[in-house]
Amino acid sequence: MKTQKIKKRFVLLCVLAVLLALIIWTAWGNTALMVNTISVSSDRIPAGFSGYRIAQVSDLHNAEFGAGNTKLLQTISENTPNIIVITGDLIDMNHTNMDTVLDFIKNAVQIAPIYYVTGNHEAALSQYDKLKEGLKSVGVIVLEDKAVQLENNGSTVTLIGLSDPNFAIRNDVFDETPAMVSTKLNDLLESENDYTILLSHRPELFETYINCGVDLVFSGHAHGGQFRLPFIGGLVAPNQGLFPKYDAGLYTDANTNMVVSRGIGNSIIPFRFNNRPEVVLVELRSES
């Protein structure tokens, strides 16, 4: 009888130890910011942009890493990017803190020029105009269905930014999302022969980006599938559902590369599992 009780206690202690270890590991994994370095090569990348470094911040959702986001700022700064791109959901519609976001941006823009596009949370935010003006006032380039040229070492590439499709619903313009995005992209690409980099929050529109002939896409939104399962990948992502096709990392199809950031913060689901927050660093390599 005593032996059975000892065995039961031992099993219970083992279960509790495993649960405690999982809790500690998950807590660490939600705060241990990492850098995911990705190299993108193409013969369309001009020689002047070989070695060009782009830091991507996505889906911050008002999160803070260190007081005043010092850890996040240090992580970006240590990787010496040429530019920083923010691919939406900088704020969170459920717990918006404009001061936290703008304080981070004021410091980040001292590291490198910032180019910003919206996500679905900005589209749902009644104070979006205030956010936009705050970003622009400190020098952020806000791209709302716009294209700009980047110059480096005598070469140029075209950077395009798309507003999140939910802004069309907000403005009472109802349209099928892929068709609407395709029309916008084709208009912006009509006269462009440069290597094209697209900032767009939505990875599920990859087929549209391919069909429009975009060279490189920076996206987010999927939060890495929130819970990453060994040998499987992400469990669930907005607008993709269970076992999302585009949840994290580099995807290549035809001549289009898409980088999907796992993001940094959380939103409706307040924690991640096996899915550390990340800053993505893309280094361009010319094959021309």
Predicted features by range, described:
Residues 82-83, 115, 140-141, 157, ...:
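Short, Asp-centered acidic motifs that coordinate Mg2+ and/or phosphate
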Residues 202-280:
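Conserved beta-sheet core of the metallophosphoesterase superfamily
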Residues 61, 91, 121-122, 147-148, ...:
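Catalytic metal-binding/acid-base residues of hydrolase active sites
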Residues 48, 52-146:
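Membrane-embedded segments
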Residues 133, 137-139, 152-196, 206-207, ...:
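Binuclear metal-dependent hydrolase catalytic cores centered on His/Asp/Glu-rich metal-binding motifs
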Residues 27, 54-70, 90-99, 122-129, ...:
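Acidic/histidine-rich helix-loop elements
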Residues 41-55, 147-161, 252-258, 284, ...:
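Beta-strand-turn-beta hairpins that frame and shape the catalytic cleft
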Residues 1-48:
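N-terminal membrane-anchoring alpha-helices
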